[in-house]
């Protein structure tokens, strides 16, 4: 009892529980969470992607198919036939240029191909400004005469750039959706011997690469081809697929 004769009562309120110490949030430090930026472009072959569907063998890949060197005599004009078995033998004055080792290996095992994606990227070799221009021009046939000068290649269908600058991609206008043309496979040597009309049964077209005349002979750059192709059928032992 207290002095007034009353019995002290106990408070009915709940005793406050002190807040537990907050856990320190784990921040994502730069060392742990970030991924270092990649500044280097790999020029070597990447891992190809392959699959199957509806009787077709699918292949997606990218390859360096051509090294472009300058000439001191005149503008350089090179023609690349768009065929899976691309491997042009070296010669004094070959008609065609280019080589795609992985695509050639796969293409040699099949008789028929069709394209699902196709583009070309220029990779300069000279870090400084190189005078002149580089031109990429796709022709969907072989009957049109190949231009002999750089200016004749320059039109609304071509890509014109400075050889020392990269980052430009050239996409030929070919049918890739739905049911694109099914073409036969053939090696480069047998393909060169065909008439211009018959080449249309094996190739969707040709890429012409032109570069300006230079004061000295130098390597201007590399041409990379990115592609997605589908193939099927058996091949024969000859250069032409059955």
Swiss-Prot record:
Q: Where is the composition biased (Basic residues)?
A: 11-27
Give an example GO cellular component term for this record: T=3 icosahedral viral capsid
Where it sits in the cell: the answer is:
Virion
Check the record and name the InterPro entries matching this protein. Answer: Capsid_prot_S-dom_vir (IPR000937), Viral_coat (IPR029053)
Gene3D superfamilies for this protein = 2.60.120.20
Q: What's one GO MF term for it?
A: structural molecule activity
The answer on whether this UniProt entry bears the keyword rRNA processing reads no
Task: Mark out the compositionally biased spans (Polar residues).
Answer: 35-44
Which stretches does the entry tag as region Disordered?
1-54
Q: Which domain of life is it from?
A: Viruses
Which SUPFAM superfamilies does this one have? Answer: Positive stranded ssRNA viruses
Q: What is its main location?
A: virion
Alphabetically list the UniProt keywords: Capsid protein, T=3 icosahedral capsid protein, Virion
Q: Main role?
A: Capsid protein self-assembles to form an icosahedral capsid with a T=3 symmetry, about 32-35 nm in diameter, and consisting of 180 capsid proteins.
Report the sequence similarity comment from the record: Belongs to the icosahedral plant coat protein family.
Q: How does it assemble?
A: Homomultimer.
Q: What is this protein called?
A: Capsid protein
User: Origin organism of this chain?
Assistant: Panicum mosaic virus (strain United States/Kansas 109S)
